[in-house]
Amino acid sequence: MIKPVGSDELKPLFVYDPEEHHKLSHEAESLPSVVISSQGPRVSSMMGAGYFSPAGFMNVADAMGAAEKMTLSDGSSSCSVLCLLENTDAIGDAKRIALRDPNVEGNPVLAVMDIEAIEEVSDEQMAVMTDKVYRTTDMDHIGVKTFNSQGRVAVSGPIQVLNFSYFQADFPDTFRTAVEIRNEIKEHGWSKVVAFQTRNPMHRAHEELCRMPMESLDADGVVVHMLLGKLKKGDIPAPVRDAAIRTMAEVYFPPNTVMVTGYGFDMLYAGPREAVLHAYFRQNMGATHFIIGREPPAWVTTTVPSTPRPSSMTKCQRAPWRSRSSCRPHGLLQEAEQDCDDARRAGSHQGRLRTALRHQGREMLGQGIAPPPEFSRPEVAKILMDLLPVHQQLILIWFSGKTRPGVGRWRVFLCAAGALWPEAVAVANMEKRSSTG
């Protein structure tokens, strides 16, 4: 099995030993404690689950290094992981504290931290980290606003994680740690594993994005990996996505070839930098290949200049742990009038691919009208109509017309999966450079 990033084995921070877990939970109730920001539980859950592997929340120097260069002061690769508080009045002079969950009633203890440093983060440092990650400091950007709405006091130190916030309780059939996914991959006997990141239900286009690389790579299986944290207004709620994806997988894929899972993290809408982070997660969970869309899922505002976006392939290849990654383009659809399977088998990318973006989901679902079969499988459409709240806006995309000039030349940009456009898709091979971590 492919090795985790920069290590021979995962380093989850969750306390798995039952006796130690009980002992630590009891101790935590007597420790000074702070209720952390709403972002904190997602980050601690990801560290506890083994999706990324810093020893805990970072000091400012390491967070700045991770934001600017994706490396820490010791040269290891990581993303920025900060615990930002409004103040430290509740901590006092304590060196060991309990971190409490703001997102669960009663604020249960998430983790225990051994404090190494308490530092003020300057406005300039916040601006640098914001710009490096999101490529904008516009407060209309949901990720920028969330990051900057936290306090300015960074508390750093190693942590021991005691629970996964609400994710495990609310999504018991879907939430999986990186450790659990690796174990399931081993149980299946898979050696070549394709991962697909999604914040949407899986429609015909998404289905084909999974099917084509599985066939061309002769992969053993695909792991559909859903975001279970916060999205933006208008995105489909996690329970609806879960039902739609499971139905699609059960009906339209061979048995024992699709693993439907989820993880407790928010969508950051951070463009190419988020692509690197998502690939990091997938390698740690055991995927050898990762399906990634052409355009970065970034938050568009009126004040962000419409300049060409950087190549996420370049971002990923320059990341220290992905220096020898590879990418191959795949066509998605030939003609909307053709069955997707026929289009895929035809192997031609000269068909009609003009996209039409239509905000008609609200009206169609409200009237009980299913989306076109070229867009969505009838079973998936029925679930969306049955379960999606009437007020939920759904963006439907289906395809007709001719390709744009130049699309046939396959200028592929590697970016975070989610904004999956029809003209191109890349499959990043994470196995070829695994020996370098």
Curated annotation (Swiss-Prot):
Top-level class of the enzyme under EC nomenclature: transferase
Family: Belongs to the sulfate adenylyltransferase family.
Source lineage: Bacteria
Sequence intervals crossing the membrane: none
Compositionally biased spans, kind Low complexity: 303-314
Span list, region Disordered: 303-322
EC number(s) reported in the record: 2.7.7.4
InterPro entries listed in its UniProt record: ATP-Sase_PUA-like_dom, PUA-like_sf, Rossmann-like_a/b/a_fold, SO4_adenylyltransferase_pro, Sulfurylase_cat_dom, Sulphate_adenylyltransferase
Domain of life: Bacteria
UniProt protein name: Sulfate adenylyltransferase
Keywords (A to Z) from UniProt: ATP-binding, Nucleotide-binding, Nucleotidyltransferase, Transferase
Organism field: Riftia pachyptila sulfur-oxidizing endosymbiont
